[in-house]
Amino acid sequence: HLPESHLAATKSLERLTFDEALALQLLLARRRHQFESLHTTPRLFRSGGLLEIFDNNLPFELTAGQIEVGNEIESDMKSQRPMHRLLQGEVGSGKTIVALRALLAVVDTGGQGALLAPTEVLAAQHFRSISATLGELATAGMLGGSDRATRVVLLTGSTPAPARKEVLAQIKDGSAGIVIGTHALLSEGVDFADLGLIVVDEQHRFGVEQRDALKLKAQLPPHLLVMTATPIPRTVAMTVFGDLDISTLTELPKGRSPITTHVIHEVEKPHYVERAWERILEEVSKGAQAYVVAPRIESSEKDGDESREHAHSVESLYQFLTQGPLRSLRVGLLHGKLTSEEKDRIMRSFAQGDIDCLVATTVIEVGVDVPNATVMVIADADRFGISQLHQLRGRVGRGAKPGLCLLLTTVDEQSAAMERLQAVARSVDGFELARVDLDQRREGDVLGASQSGSRSHLRLLRVLRDESMIEDARIDATTIL
């Protein structure tokens, strides 16, 4: 192709870019079309059911957003067409309650709901918090249990064989109304009596293939609710999750506290680092708890950056803190190499207040909920992406006390990495940060095959720049199909 003028070249490029946008939107529209042609069991709201009892006993008011999204879900599930909805919301915006209400609505109609979590730590936490939130509504089959209740079960890769056998039987005979688990739910031998709803937590950890694998466990196509706390700019949502309807929770529940974030340069301001450890001592003396996060487990781990040999590891930080500035505190250590039982035990101790400060890797990034934690120090913060830092900091300020997040770094003041950290310190708006993140990264990373089920590298199309083109392509794709 040899264009005769700059204008002709520009027009040709525009045309090729549009072709790429259209091909992608056709793929998503086809998925959507296939989904819409399916039929499923409508799940109608039942008066006097578990959901109504649950709502009447809630110790707090639902936010306007939670009620609105709840209505959208209720309307979806009444239909004979399976719900296919993405629920995105800021860290701590109360997505789990919305999902739990949907699960109860399905149990009320005689169906079962499955909650798929990305890690065992998160699955175990969901199991504990949902069981506690439901109270006697989760006591079906137990001695002295309520006759107006369901059974909540947990299934992960490390569920011991005898317990696993019992849980599988309860899933198969339908006595387990709410099934919480990890990838283990996708394995052979897990058979549901009537799987009516799948809730996938933290979407970016699961590919399309895994969503589809769980759907095959149902006799009729189940309703699907996908939750993510990583806010997604609208065009990315249209591009990556174009086959899903989108609901957004923007307001935080009452009682949530603000989070302040500061960047600390370790080399230029070493006394500020000492002050960070003092701040943890002060918070603990007031009865609060703290996190210290590092990017790697051992100092010996290489990450391809030879100039950063001194990078912090959780093991070296744990030794330094327990022998130095935090030696008077009860300090715990949590990372991915521990067994599931150890991870669960440590998280439980921290949640119960038996550990003052938890030194951890990003195991704690998603969903960990300890309202008493008020301060987080992130070592080598430049090693984390914007959305990861936003997720991590969302672990503090979850209760009535304000949260503080301190980002430690040694990078150059003028570097792109420092720009990222300053952006996180400036804003607590996840949607704004998601756009900054997208500006800084190649879009191929955002549209990974693991996320979209489509090819991972866009050649010409740029998600933010070509926003209006993507919208046009979406309209055309819908018309073509």
Predicted regions: what they are:
Residues 1-57:
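Upstream accessory/linker segments immediately N-terminal to the RecA-like ATPase cores of bacterial MutS
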Residues 42-88:
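Conserved pre-motif I regulatory segment
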Residues 84, 98-127, 137-150:
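Conserved SF1/SF2 helicase motif Ia
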Residues 90, 118, 203-205, 216-239:
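Conserved helicase ATPase motor motifs in RecA-like P-loop NTPase domains
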Residues 147-149, 155-179, 187-195, 340-357:
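Conserved motor-coupling elements within RecA-like helicase/translocase cores
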Residues 170, 184-226:
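SF2 helicase catalytic motif II
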Residues 243-312:
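Conserved interdomain linker/interface between the two RecA-like ATPase lobes of SF2 helicase motors
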Residues 268-289, 309, 313-481:
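C-terminal helicase module of SF1/SF2 nucleic-acid helicases/translocases
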